[in-house]
């Protein structure tokens, strides 16, 4: 599993989407550093959820990752945070 500092220089998520998310939440002005930090955090979360979803599908004897694998993996990750 990669951590945010081990990811490639070509992020999977776009910076423009990070600006939109922050602005939708009420941010009037958003620094590039803030948008980039949100992108790094969300990519790390997505990587952790995806890793666990892959494990769940393998445990179920499937090669296909299903929506319920993602949902369960996200729920498990959120339960660890709280």
Q: Residue ranges of each PLM-predicted region?
A:
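Intrinsically disordered, low-complexity terminal regions
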Residues: 1-82
């Amino acid at each position: 599993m990669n951590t945010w500092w081990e990811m490639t220089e070509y992020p999977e998520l776009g910076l423009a989407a990070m600006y939109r998310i922050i602005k939708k939440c009420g941010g009037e002005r958003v620094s590039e550093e803030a948008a980039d930090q949100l992108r790094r955090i969300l990519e790390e979360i997505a990587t952790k959820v995806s890793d666990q979803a892959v494990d769940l599908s393998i445990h179920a004897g499937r090669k296909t990752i299903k929506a319920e694998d993602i949902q369960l993996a996200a729920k498990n990750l959120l339960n660890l945070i709280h």
